[in-house]
From Swiss-Prot:
Entry keyword annotation includes Iron: yes
Organism: Pyrococcus furiosus (strain ATCC 43587 / DSM 3638 / JCM 8422 / Vc1)
Transmembrane as UniProt keyword: no
Gene3D superfamilies with a match to the protein in the record: 3.30.70.20
Organism placement in taxonomy: Archaea, Methanobacteriati, Methanobacteriota, Thermococci, Thermococcales
Origin: domain of life: Archaea
Cofactor(s) recorded in Swiss-Prot or TrEMBL: [4Fe-4S] cluster
Protein name: Aliphatic sulfonate oxidoreductase, polyferredoxin-like subunit
Cofactor mode of binding and number, as noted: Binds 4 [4Fe-4S] clusters per subunit.
Keywords: 4Fe-4S, Cytoplasm, Electron transport, Iron, Iron-sulfur, Metal-binding, Transport
Length: 173
């Protein structure tokens, strides 16, 4: 009998609960890089309109377009969490994963030498923890089958911001 596989998780983002404090960015960069380096954070908060903060991270698409686009197989899927994992030694920073991603989530921070994508911190995302501790709860771990709707969440930050601004302000920009 094979080892039991953990149910796959993803991070549900509720932008209207985001204060824009960016503790998630700080915590993520400390967890992954050992320093405060928001540019290398696997989650980013965008404020394209005043007062509308949009946390943005990988939704772990079930068809993994970024993984499939990588010419060097630097991206793989963690068997336990279903998260995309980057092999920094194989990454040639070509940007194929960025182009393939519907949300344009992967980034190549200056000085990093490889792409960064959310790996769900091995199943215990630190950004979700700090957001909860700060009392915002804009980020939440969810499980289950979201295949029918995942493209709803896999949008670029500008598109998400425009959607929210239309709802808040009731007009097009």
């Amino acid at each position: 009998m094979s080892e039991e596989v953990q149910e796959r998780i993803w991070i549900l983002i509720t932008p209207d609960k985001c204060s824009g404090c960016r503790l998630c960015e700080v915590t993520c960069s400390l967890e992954h890089e050992g320093i405060i380096w928001p540019e290398a954070s696997r989650i980013r908060v965008f404020e394209l309109f005043p007062g509308i903060n949009v946390p943005h991270t990988c939704v772990q698409c079930p068809d993994y377009p970024c993984v499939n686009a990588c010419p060097t197989n630097a991206l793989s899927v963690d068997e336990k969490t279903g998260a995309v994992v980057v092999n920094e030694e194989k990454c040639i920073t070509c940007g194929a994963c960025v182009l393939a991603c519907p949300g344009k989530v992967p980034r190549i921070p200056a000085g990093k030498g490889s792409v960064v994508i959310c790996d769900l911190c091995g199943g215990n995302p630190k950004c979700v923890e700090i957001c909860h501790e700060a009392g915002h709860d804009a980020l939440k771990i969810v499980t289950g089958n979201y295949r029918p709707i995942y493209r709803t969440f896999a949008k670029d930050p500008q598109e998400k911001s425009l959607d929210i601004a239309r709802k808040v302000f009731g007009e097009d920009f």
